[in-house]
Amino acid sequence: QKTAYDITTRLVGSELCIRDRAYFWRGESNYRLDRFPQAGNDYRLYLEFATSKDGQEYGLALYNLGYTYFKQKNYGNAGTWFTRFVGRGSANERAMQADAYNRIGDCNFYDRRFEQARQDYARAVEIDPSLGDYSLYQEAFVRGLQRDYNGKVQTLNRLISDYPESQYMDDALYEQGRAFVQMEDNANAIARFNILVKKFPESNVARRAANEIGLLYYQDDKYPEAIQAYKQVIASYPGSEEARLAQRDLKSIYIDLNKVDEYANFASTIPGGANFDVNERDSLTYVAAERVYMRGEVTEARNSFTRYLQTFPEGAFSLNANYYIGLI
């Protein structure tokens, strides 16, 4: 690349018919060396001096100039040059046209012009369906930002059915599950998350999905299913943030169920797991009994406070427990 760059630099001072191509090829050299500001300057000079605007090089200069700005996160100028490129409408550049529409969509997305971005992604998949999985994924994501959750689900269905080997498949399943959550359709959300966890267990989004399965069951008061889901997260992803969150929520479920001893037994089986000391067990056993009382389950509350006092006769909450027993 250094040699090509030196040669084209010497040619820049030549006759106009040679000079424009020299700018183009120096721009190419700079681009491949990741010198995007210099490449952009050369492409602009080529476009200024180009003797023909119909050739492939002219279109490529417009396209690459868009990328020089895009690589520098200058999305306003990037969008301008990509738009000029797609305006050529060349049938011989369909793949590049579709890619340029994706980049225009990205530029509009970053500038929060979501409806325009959605239209750009849709246009990209129309022009060249072979590159459509990215376009559909982005279009669906934008629909979610627009709170068109049903549209998001339908767009992702197209991606899943038309591009079964897509690199975006795991993300598509996760985003589809999230759309169902937003629609308060927990059953379909859980179904999508289960497919994701089964097909892509090592994916980062699979870990999140596995945890959300437990949370959705928990929110629906389906405690046995939530317990099973959270235990699966802890077993499948030990040491992860998702496992930590699952253990936290699992503790809350067992407290709600007034089964602190059962949680303590489970926690003791986790490799490198919870430090479940006497003081915490004291506190959680009392909290579980108090929650039973607050739910109005008087008989169970009396039994729970009595068990607390038997287990922790000098416990931190023994006075409170005796007080509640007196009220009952």
Regions found by a protein language model. Give the residues of each.
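Single conserved hydrophobic/aromatic residue that forms the stacking wall/gate
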Residues: 1-18
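Short solvent-exposed coil/turn linkers within tandem alpha-helical repeat scaffolds
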Residues: 14, 19, 46-59, 85-98, ...
